[in-house]
Swiss-Prot record:
Sequence positions bearing Phosphotyrosine: 142, 159, 172
Transmembrane segments annotated in the record for this chain: none
DH domain: residues covered: 193-371
Record's function text: Guanine nucleotide exchange factor for the Rho family of Ras-related GTPases. Plays an important role in angiogenesis. Its recruitment by phosphorylated EPHA2 is critical for EFNA1-induced RAC1 GTPase activation and vascular endothelial cell migration and assembly.
Residues in SH3 domain copies: 576-642, 806-867
Annotated GO CC locations: cytoplasm; cytosol; plasma membrane
Sites of Phosphoserine modification: 566, 616
GO molecular function: epidermal growth factor receptor binding; guanyl-nucleotide exchange factor activity; phosphotyrosine residue binding; zinc ion binding
Post-translational modification comment from the UniProt entry: Phosphorylated on tyrosine residues in response to FGR activation.
Name of this chain's protein: Guanine nucleotide exchange factor VAV2
Length: 868
């Protein structure tokens, strides 16, 4: 058996991998194991399992997500503990990039093998590896893994549970189970079932409250004698406040039950705000467990005291660590209990109030999960902060991190391509130079003042680090070009940039005359539209800077009109439109209106005036064509003619007839173009139409025995092949590049547009058509590993092959949801969602597909079909 397979089985024996992990499937390949280990989480978990306490769980980033920084930090933590605690020499270990980039996976396997032979591992009774029957010459199987790593993501199941929390639900069931509860039987009436549900809510709440009292009486009281106030607060968090709330909560439930339970929904609605304190408890739970474990390991007096206390609670059946998990599990059960009660209350007069109570507890669960998630995010941001030199601002002010990693960066001004490490946040991209394990700050680029555009070059360059895109300043200042290692990496970075920009500049930010900005709310705030919480601890939603209301991203378009807008801002029923103006010059936002949103336009655009003081240099208006509103210089417009039509200007490029020009080929497919131009001399070119594509025109040119294709972008009445140089017409563009080399835009295309194809004599007969495989393709495609087919796979196929996920259910979206992250799935009310995974359901997230996209979505935002 190959050594990597033995390694996988050993990790299963160490309870690091589950018994049915894909590494033991017959179809498994070595990359399956490499991919499982690349983020360092499982290796750190391995050390914890072999020697509890050898590694501080606080040092592990259990959800590194899209962060190279956090993955490498995990790997370095593993290597340090192997050296310091297990005594492995540096020569017996590996470089972090040997694993992260899978440069030398053989060294990783060798290091894990040495751990398996260590006396600590041997004491567990687990057979080490390799065994004598190891297959020889494993080196061949490790080749090409680095290329596979370039093409495949790390695992992104970011909403599942942290490994050390998996048993929490079982602990809850053991502690809170109610022995007197009878299972529902066949033949029971709906009233009987409803009574069972009511009884379960009451009795489990009573059992839970007794558990809280046990913790207070038998642990908190005695341990105050041996712990400092700071340690007490770290271990028990705000448990005293929880106990006070649940004393009142249980009394209210009991009173409702004495009246038949018809007012139980009202009780939950009344206590929703008071239960928000669970956000603090749950977000500090991990730190509390870590502090408790450290105290138990470092202080013998404390350990003995805890053992004495444990014997007083249910005969020592549960440890303090177990009991501290129960509050987090309990608060996330309320919506499940109410959902079951609602399903047996079809004809009850309080049904509507029960629905409202269910939604309230679902909202509470989502709020608590997001607070916990934000605490983890802030921890990651703090680690970034400590690693970047010369950083004078708090990174958390820039929103949530999206992605980080190594790119090459070139300033559009000086054209020097440099190796840089980027941290992308919602608001900025931090550009750094890597210095060992730290980073030197080079640039902070504010995304609000930039737009991203693709490098329009069609052809793939076979060299790495040649896949580029632009970040262009909206006011013509310095821009940047970024280069990625692979096309897939470029796609991921561009998607994350798009998501970040949509967070700080959402499409509906000015809907109904509001002026919404992403904002951190100091107090718990409800969305003005849906009335649900704005969730988390920072940048929870959007604040209107005019009227002060808060909203979710997905609710911006349905917020009632802004109350602080002037009458001219609102389309009053029956009121006529404001005076129309026509733009007499282009305005792209420079100069910018002080503290106001910008309205950009082109010469000839018609603008409806919303607010305009004759003595003011700035007016507010709305473009008639797009309905977009904002501020602009009053000197850039003049009154429109009475009929409302703008003066005659130049016709758009789509209305110009280019057929007389010797370079215009009309409608022509890419393959046909290749066949036509390959027999011509270098520098021969044509312009062709692409009617089925978003960009209508493309330049095709023969250069160094290859045909290159460049799309021509038409946007905002300008036409260009690169953002750095724009033209008013296609003819102007062609005339420019007849005299200037394309190298200005594309480094490897050092040629002008020399010979229009119609004016050149054919020099040779056409060669036979190229095969499809030989044609350059701009579309993303997988690089198929040798020996693997990407045809439909059997259930045992490697997880990184192309496959159709198994649908385990369907649901209908009850609310709109706007993704804040590329891993999330946006929903519109009424969308039918295919459910692929409920892993992470206790964290509030399911995985599914709708509208052609796959991602994670809040489980409480959908109603599962076929489930009563």
């Amino acid at each position: 058996m190959e050594q990597w397979r033995q390694c996988g089985r050993w990790l299963i024996d160490c309870k690091v991998l589950p018994p049915n992990h894909r590494v033991v499937w017959p179809s498994a390949v070595v990359f399956d194991l490499a991919q499982a280990l690349r983020d360092g989480v499982l290796l750190c978990q391995l050390l914890h399992n072999l020697s509890p306490g050898s590694i501080d769980l606080k040092d592990i980033n259990f959800r590194p997500q899209m962060s190279q920084f956090l993955c490498l930090k995990n790997i370095r933590t593993f290597l340090k503990v192997c050296h310091d605690k297990f005594g492995l020499r540096n020569s017996e270990l590996f470089d972090p990039f040997d694993l992260f980039d899978v440069r030398d996976f053989g060294k990783v396997i060798s290091a894990v093998s040495r751990l398996s032979l260590h006396s600590i591992a041997q004491s567990k009774g687990i057979r080490p590896f390799p065994s004598e029957e190891t297959a020889e010459n494993d080196d061949d199987v490790y080749r090409s893994l680095e290329e596979l790593a370039d093409e495949h993501d790390l695992g992104e199941d970011i909403y599942d549970c942290v490994p050390c929390e998996d048993e929490g639900d079982d602990i809850y069931e053991d502690i809170i189970k109610v022995e007197v509860q009878q299972p529902m039987k066949m033949g029971m009436t709906e009233d009987d079932k409803r009574s069972c549900c009511l009884l379960e809510i009451q009795e489990t709440e009573a059992k839970y409250y007794r558990t809280l009292e046990d913790i207070e009486k038998n642990y908190m009281g005695p341990l105050r004698l041996v712990l400092s106030p700071a340690d007490m607060a770290a271990v028990f968090i705000n448990l005293e406040d929880l106990i006070k709330v649940h004393h009142s909560f249980l009394r209210a439930i009991d009173v409702s039950m004495m009246a038949g339970g018809s007012t139980l929904a009202k009780v939950f609605l009344e206590f929703k705000e008071r239960l928000l304190i669970y956000g603090e408890y749950c977000s500090h739970m991990e730190h509390a467990q870590s502090t408790l474990n450290q105290l138990l390991a470092s202080r013998e007096d404390f350990r003995q005291k805890v053992e004495e206390c444990t014997l007083r609670v249910q005969d020592g059946k549960f440890k303090l660590q177990d009991l501290l998990v129960v509050p987090m599990q309990r608060v996330l059960k309320y919506h499940l209990l109410l959902k079951e009660l609602l399903s047996h209350s079809a004809d009850r007069p309080e049904r509507q109030q029960l629905k409202e109570a269910l939604e309230a507890m679902q909202d509470l669960a989502m709020y608590i999960n997001e607070v916990k998630r934000d605490k983890e995010t802030l921890k990651k941001i703090s680690e970034f902060q400590c690693s970047i030199e010369n950083l004078q601002v708090k990174l958390e002010e820039f929103g949530r991190p999206k992605i980080d990693g190594e790119l090459k960066v070139r300033s559009i001004v000086n054209h020097t391509k440099q190796d840089r490490y980027l941290f992308l946040f919602d608001k900025v991209v931090i550009v750094c130079k890597r210095k060992g394990y730290s980073y030197e700050l080079k640039e902070v680029i504010e995304l609000l003042f930039h737009k991203m555009t693709d490098d329009p070059m069609h052809n793939k360059d076979i060299k790495k680090w040649s896949y580029g895109f632009y970040l262009i300043h909206l006011q013509g200042k310095q821009g940047f070009q970024f280069f990625c290692k692979t096309e897939d990496m470029k796609r991921k970075w561009m998607e994350q940039f798009e998501m970040a920009m949509s967070n700080i500049k959402p499409d509906k930010a000015n809907a109904n005359h509001h002026s919404f900005q992403m904002y951190t709310f100091d107090k718990t705030t409800n969305c003005k539209a849906c009335k649900m919480f704005l969730r988390g601890t920072f940048y929870q939603g959007y604040l209107c800077t005019r009227c002060g209301v808060g909203a979710h991203k997905e609710c911006l378009e349905v917020i009632p009109p802004c109350k602080m807008s002037s009458p001219a801002d609102v389309d009053a029923p029956g009121a006529g439109p404001g005076p129309k103006m026509v733009a007499v010059q282009n305005y792209h936002g420079n100069p910018a209106p002080p503290g106001k949103p910008v309205l950009t336009f082109q010469t000839g655009d018609v603008i409806e005036l919303l607010r305009g003081d004759p003595d003011s240099p700035w007016w507010e208006g709305r473009l008639v064509q797009t309905r977009k509103s904002g501020y602009f210089p009053s000197s850039s417009v003049k009154p429109c003619p009475v009929d409302g039509r703008p003066p005659t200007g130049r016709p758009p490029s789509r209305e110009i007839d280019y057929t007389a020009y010797p370079w215009f080929a009309g409608n022509m497919e890419r393959q046909q173009t290749d066949n036509l131009l390959k027999s011509h001399a270098s520098g021969t070119y044509l312009i062709r139409e692409r009617p089925a594509e978003a960009e209508r025109f493309a330049i095709s040119i023969k250069f160094n025995d290859e045909v290159k294709h460049i799309k021509v972008v038409e946007k905002d009445s300008w036409i260009h092949i690169t953002e750095a140089k724009k033209f008013e017409s296609l003819l102007e563009l062609v005339e420019y590049y007849q005299c200037h080399s394309l190298k200005e835009s594309f480094k490897q295309l050092d040629t002008t547009l020399k010979f229009p194809y119609k004016s050149r004599e054919r020099t040779t007969s056409r060669a036979s058509s190229r095969s499809p495989a030989s044609c350059a393709s701009y579309n993303f495609s997988f690089l198929s590993p040798q020996g693997l087919s990407f045809a439909p796979q059997a259930p045992s196929a490697p997880f990184w092959s192309v496959f159709t996920p198994r649908v385990i259910g369907t649901a209908v979206a009850r609310y709109n949801f706007a993704a804040r992250d590329m891993r999330e799935l946006s929903l519109r009310e009424g969308d039918v969602v295919k459910i692929y995974s409920r892993i992470g359901g206790d964290q509030g997230w399911w995985k599914g597909e709708t509208n052609g996209r796959i991602g994670w979505f809040p489980s409480t935002y959908v109603e599962e079909e076929g489930v009563q």
